[in-house]
A protein has these predicted regions:
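Iron-sulfur cluster-binding electron-transfer modules in prokaryotic oxidoreductases
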Residues: 1-248
């Protein structure tokens, strides 16, 4: 490719779901990239900013920029974190490095489709799969269409999954509904968050999904907790795990 590519691993993925980070790295390497992992990287600052501590998050944002300033592309398995870097670093002085990093950061599926032009993932996954696109990816990054705008196409993640051999993508009643997580929202409005999550899971189960997949592990973490408590017959997998052939 001839460009420097870095992997940005969200803090919750690093601590709770390292297999998603490994799958993302292996997937990018399968497509011929020499991917670097800057050891100085840390949280993008989204949790603090979402809690109302936006100015307190500036030091974290500056650290993020320093870690990734030398790269042409910064790829992450999280639409939510990518959205934060692209759209919520406005309080930083807009230096060349800040502007460069904000423009270089990509959600994984968007990078595969829009930059690498991946058409055939080259793997099989013979399961019934429900697709969940997180709100920041869907309505923030515009990586999938929204029903309130009369749009029905599935976006970049669904486009990739449709080319996976043996997969059956289930049609949901509410294909673009929020899972209810919302970071701090799941703490401050726990009952509402849990109800929204249960509705989301039940939509997938009702249509026979064996697996719920998403580009955001934060959404899947929320749904997985509900699935376990309710003993529901479905599991969650990050889209990187499917596209990498990690799970079959």
């Amino acid at each position: 490719m001839g460009h420097r590519v870095a992997l940005f691993v969200p803090c919750y993925v690093d601590q709770l779901y390292p297999q998603v980070a490994r799958a993302t790295l292996e997937l990018l390497e399968r497509h011929g990239l020499d991917v670097e992992f800057p050891p100085a990287q840390t949280c993008c600052g989204q949790p603090m900013a979402n809690a109302g501590c936006e100015r307190d998050a500036l030091a974290t944002a500056r650290t993020f920029v320093r870690a990734f300033a030398g790269y042409d592309f910064v790829v992450s398995p999280s639409g939510s974190c990518v959205y934060h870097v692209r759209h919520h670093y406005d309080l930083l002085e807009q230096t060349d490095d800040v502007r460069r990093v904000r423009g270089a950061v990509y959600e994984l599926c968007q990078f595969l489709v829009d930059v690498l032009n991946v058409d055939d993932p080259g793997i099989a996954f013979p399961h019934r799969v429900g697709v969940h696109v997180g709100c920041h990816a869907q309505r923030g990054l515009r990586l999938a269409e929204s029903s309130e705008l009369g749009e029905t196409s599935g976006g970049v993640m669904r486009r990739l999954l449709e080319r996976v051999r043996g997969i059956e993508l289930v049609e949901l009643d509410r294909f673009d509904e929020c899972c209810g997580f919302g970071g701090v929202f799941s703490v401050t409005e726990a009952a509402v968050s849990a109800r929204m999550g249960l509705d989301r899971v039940q939509d997938h189960v009702r249509h026979g999904a064996d697996v719920i997949t998403s580009g955001d592990m934060s959404c899947l973490m929320h749904l997985e907790g509900i699935i376990r408590r309710q003993h529901l017959p479905v599991r969650v997998l990050h889209v990187a795990e499917i596209l990498n052939g990690t799970e079959a």
